[in-house]
Amino acid sequence: MAQINENYLKLPGSYLFSEIARRVNEFKVQNPDADIIRLGIGDVTRPLAPVVVEAMKQAVEEMGRAETFRGYGPEQGYDFLIEKIIANDYAPRGVQLGMDEVFVSDGAKSDTANFQEIFGVDNIMAVTDPVYPVYVDSNVMAGRTGNYDIEKGQYGRIIYLPCTEEGDMKPELPTAPVDMIYLCFPNNPTGMTLTKEELKVWVDYARENKAIILFDSAYEAFIREEGVPRSIYEVEGAREVAVEFRSFSKTAGFTGTRCAYTVVPKDIMIYDSTGEGHSLNKLWLRRQTTKFNGVSYPVQAGAAAVYTEEGKKQIQATIDYYMENARIIREGLQEAGFKVFGGVNAPYIWMKTPGTMGSWEFFDKLMTEAHVVGTPGAGFGANGEGFFRLTAFGTRENTEKAIERIKARMK
């Protein structure tokens, strides 16, 4: 008799965005003429930059000729892409990385979910609350989180770090020792950021406690303000304790193309039951060479084109487009009387629901009355209750139309 990994039974009944899709589809069946505008799930709408398309076309043509055909590539990524990543994303900020410290992958979602495999099941993990669900769900699958408390909306063995309105949506250090710390800045879902000084507090904590920070920096390209670090490695000592995840998905429109990378410095040590240290970099390389065959050559060629002079201009134009959407949403909601966070250094706007209205209640009200779909804050954790996320990844026309509807119908 085949038996399941019973940790899967501890997961919520459905993934957050699957539940949203179910409700939207149900509403559309009942209201077939409704013009639904989706400002919920964080998929992009702008096409790939022309320079990326041309690079991928050329790479595909190379694959069609015997003399330039490539089979399996290096699991860690082609040197031509890793060199550009280091030279453009890190060196200008004073961060020195080795070629063997960057791992090209098919997405930050898979990397943030998979990286926990290296950690022992008894490690204590900490997450911000609200939080991107993948961090929690992947650890539930591994058996690291304990059982789910329905009343609290939390797992018994996770240390939750509340991000509250009173605390400006920024987490405080855990009061008990933890081993794994998930941080995402610019944050999904709140859109907030940390200063270098605030980030240093976390790095210092991790160094003192031999903890490891799993730092999701997928939205760093959207940072507009000076003084906001784009990489955790801008903080002294971070190379000893932090893994950084980045993605081309939102930066360059690769959500349907799939390319990202993870930085694992060779300075980071992880310990066995005897206290002996082991290289986290070597363990992640071992994991990747066992379970991953690398990102396709045409996709990596497209990602490398992002770093050309023309590529940088085209990508920046797309980022500017989305951040103008963010401004429209943020200012429109403020004009309508909503309290909002984010939308300045991130494509996410985190709004407080009216009065005592719950997140899912507001979701239904917004969909039925304004025909606009967002993401209920409760789907990101117990502390997301009473909040709602909108994203700036829609078209300009739909973004403007959605905000006008909200201002007119949701007062």
From Swiss-Prot:
Substrate binds at residues 15, 42, 109, 132, 188, 293, 389. The keyword Transferase applies. It is an enzyme of class 2 (transferase). It comes from the Bacteria. Pfam families: Aminotran_1_2. The keyword DNA-binding does not apply. One of its GO terms (biological process) is lysine biosynthetic process via diaminopimelate, diaminopimelate-aminotransferase pathway. Keywords: Aminotransferase, Pyridoxal phosphate, Transferase. Its EC number is 2.6.1.83. Disulfide bonds: none annotated. CDD domains: AAT_like. It catalyses: (2S,6S)-2,6-diaminopimelate + 2-oxoglutarate = (S)-2,3,4,5-tetrahydrodipicolinate + L-glutamate + H2O + H(+). Involved in the synthesis of meso-diaminopimelate (m-DAP or DL-DAP), required for both lysine and peptidoglycan biosynthesis. Catalyzes the direct conversion of tetrahydrodipicolinate to LL-diaminopimelate. Homodimer. This is LL-diaminopimelate aminotransferase. It comes from Desulfitobacterium hafniense (strain Y51). The lineage of its organism: Bacteria, Bacillati, Bacillota, Clostridia, Eubacteriales. The gene is dapL.
